[in-house]
Amino acid sequence: LDEKEYDEYKKESKTMGTNYKERFNDSLKMQKYLRASERRANIIKNASAKLDAVKTIFKERNDMSYGLMYCNPGQIDDVRELCTNNSPNPIYVRKITEKNTPTRKERQVIMDAMIRGDYHALLAIKILDEGWDCPELRYCILMASSGNDKEYVQRRGRILRKFSGVYPNGDKKTRADIYDLCVIPDISGFSDDEVAMEVALAEKEFKRMRQISDSSENPENCDSIIKNFYKQISKSSS
């Protein structure tokens, strides 16, 4: 988080921490907790550092074809601009939002067009929550992650499905790359109640990370990254 985002995050965390223990016994405290939680979640969802991470992914991948960039509403236009301005090779995307969600028949037309090379990737909101299987995809950038275990497993599964077809260059799908962008804020200086709450919330992030690590080709590398994140938050909470 940048300085402004962190200040806002800490402010909402303080409100949540104040109402954390008593929220189940006091409806007003629960209301304050939930409102602050929603505002804070939006700070995490739209963290500017995620855009920096996307830029890094663009640089690291040699080919941006057959992909999905799963965005938050607040960042989809920013990501589209990054794609357009990607140098030396612009990334052409098909933008899909809740307002223009395609029918089942239109979905296959869109995927066929991507396979032909009409565009490199789908830039979408909630596409993985609409029962849309995407076996053709070779990579997915998850800027918007779900804290719901069932939803997350479904989203991951749609990308990892086998593709029986062949790409125009003759290649077959043998793997899929999933980039799950996680935000673990610094909690040093937080009160005991705030720390307890933050650690509990961070555990959900770590659980999701471990789920994807277990399905990866490089679980050792993933586990090492997860352990480093865990050390950071443990150090901040001590």
Q: Which role does the model predict for each range below?
A:
Residues 231-238:
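Non-catalytic terminal extensions of ATP-dependent helicases
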Residues 2, 68-72, 142:
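Active-site-adjacent beta-strand anchor residues
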Residues 1-11:
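Interdomain hinge/linker at the junction between the two RecA-like core domains of SF2 helicases
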Residues 218-231:
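Short, flexible loop/turn segments with low-complexity composition
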Residues 92-217:
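Conserved RecA-like P-loop NTPase helicase motor core
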Residues 9, 79-83, 131:
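Hydrophobic packing residues within well-ordered alpha-helices of enzyme cores
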Residues 3, 48, 73-74, 125-126, ...:
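Alpha-helix N-cap/helix-start capping motif
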Residues 16-119:
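Conserved helicase/translocase motor-coupling segment
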